[in-house]
Amino acid sequence: MIQMQSTLDAADNSGARKVMCIKVLGGSHRRYAHIGDVIKVTVKEAIPRGKVKKGDVLKAVVVRTRKGVRRPDGSIIRFDRNACVLLNDTTEQPVGTRIFGPVTRELRNAKFMKIVSLAPEVL
């Protein structure tokens, strides 16, 4: 569960290392974001010469959460860190060209096939 002020790892090569959620998109008083939800983030820590710099405000899709996601068969997929992939604000396509770490199948349903195809492992 991601809410405002939550810090996440950037799971792509956009140049960001740490980002902070500043808004959960999709509803006027929506409190939590789960895997596959789009959030608004600000870059808190970035590498030099990256595509994004510290202070940039972008959209991001949540790809891993410590809370996890429950499957219809009753199993729960959990991760040890919260992570997201940064998106272009207008096209909602990934800023980076590589995805690091596994992502879940739930992204396939949420119109993020580009992220699923770039990911090294889909759980």
Swiss-Prot record:
Listed InterPro entries = Ribosomal_uL14 (IPR000218), Ribosomal_uL14_bac-type (IPR005745), Ribosomal_uL14_CS (IPR019972), Ribosomal_uL14_sf (IPR036853)
CDD domains in the cross-refs: Ribosomal_uL14 (cd00337)
Gene3D superfamilies according to UniProt: Ribosomal protein L14 (2.40.150.20)
Q: What do the Gene Ontology cellular component annotations say?
A: cytosolic large ribosomal subunit
Query: What SUPFAM superfamilies does the entry give?
Result: Ribosomal protein L14
GO molecular function per UniProt: large ribosomal subunit rRNA binding; structural constituent of ribosome
Note one Pfam family from the annotation. Ribosomal_L14
| Record key words, sorted | Ribonucleoprotein, Ribosomal protein, RNA-binding, rRNA-binding
Q: Name one GO biological process term.
A: translation
Query: Which top-rank group of organisms is this from?
Result: Bacteria
Subunit-structure text = Part of the 50S ribosomal subunit. Forms a cluster with proteins L3 and L19. In the 70S ribosome, L14 and L19 interact and together make contacts with the 16S rRNA in bridges B5 and B8.
Family to which this protein belongs: Belongs to the universal ribosomal protein uL14 family.
Job description of the protein: Binds to 23S rRNA. Forms part of two intersubunit bridges in the 70S ribosome.
Q: What HAMAP family does this protein's entry cite?
A: Ribosomal_uL14
- In Swiss-Prot or TrEMBL terms, this protein is called Large ribosomal subunit protein uL14
> Which organism was this protein described from?
Aliivibrio salmonicida (strain LFI1238)
The organism that produces this protein has a lineage beginning with: Bacteria, Pseudomonadati, Pseudomonadota, Gammaproteobacteria, Vibrionales
Its gene is rplN
